């Protein structure tokens, strides 16, 4: 792997490093049951596939899709409860990184590249995932939309690059927002479409990516 083409890797989290569905789906169903029990929302529960479809979206988009017609108060409560239920699921040992992620990050880090996370997720969740799997130390910076109050991935990545003086590198993700953020900020975009795992986007979302990978380990050779 050569530094001639970049100095840093900026990773999305959900669907890129972490198998989000193993935590977010059961956590959401816990949240939905609590909302119904408290009389805060009586709509039908979304299917697992509908829950998966919101991964990577900003909070407004998430709740408009999963709880259409819900009050702002109910959406705020649901957002807080879902976060807590996700953290509880992580504490219970749920969830997994994609194969090769932990070793791959270590290899890239040891070769002198700076690693970052840029996620639309909430900060406690993002940091909770990285901490639960012991990979926080590989990252120079961890950027989440909520913590930075920047609910646009193009701007979130731009802020990250400005604050850490990143002039070139790679954007690695699985959604169209990752492709757009990378392109908008002059990064080489690597789209993740892992073979044998659920995809949270349709095939068109990664159009425009410079490279596509079917496993995380491919990143070690493609970025060279």
Question: Where do the protein language model's features map onto the residues?
Answer:
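Conserved phosphate-coupling serine/threonine residues in phosphotransfer and NTP-handling enzymes
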Residues: 16, 119-121
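Surface-exposed amphipathic alpha-helices with a cationic face
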Residues: 102-110, 161, 179-183
């Amino acid at each position: 792997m050569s530094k001639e083409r970049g100095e840093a890797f900026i990773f999305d989290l959900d669907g890129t490093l972490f198998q989000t569905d193993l935590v977010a789906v059961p956590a959401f169903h816990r949240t939905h049951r609590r909302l119904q029990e408290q009389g805060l929302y009586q709509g039908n529960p979304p299917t697992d596939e509908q829950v998966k479809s919101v991964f990577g979206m900003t909070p407004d988009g998430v709740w408009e899709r999963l709880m259409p017609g819900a009050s702002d108060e109910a959406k705020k409560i649901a957002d807080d409860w879902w976060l807590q239920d996700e953290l509880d699921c992580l504490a219970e040992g749920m969830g997994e990184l994609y194969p090769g992620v932990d070793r791959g990050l270590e290899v890239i880090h040891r070769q002198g590249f700076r690693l970052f996370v840029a996620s639309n997720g909430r900060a406690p969740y993002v940091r909770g995932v990285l901490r639960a799997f012991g990979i926080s130390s590989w990252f120079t910076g961890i950027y989440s939309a909520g913590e930075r109050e920047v609910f646009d991935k193009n701007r979130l990545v731009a802020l990250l690059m400005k604050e850490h003086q990143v002039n070139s590198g790679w954007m690695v993700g699985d959604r169209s927002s990752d492709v757009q953020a990378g392109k908008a900020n002059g990064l080489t975009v690597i789209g993740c479409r892992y073979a044998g795992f659920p995809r949270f986007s349709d095939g068109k979302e990664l159009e425009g990516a410079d490279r596509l990978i079917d496993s995380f380990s491919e990143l070690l050779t493609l970025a060279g």
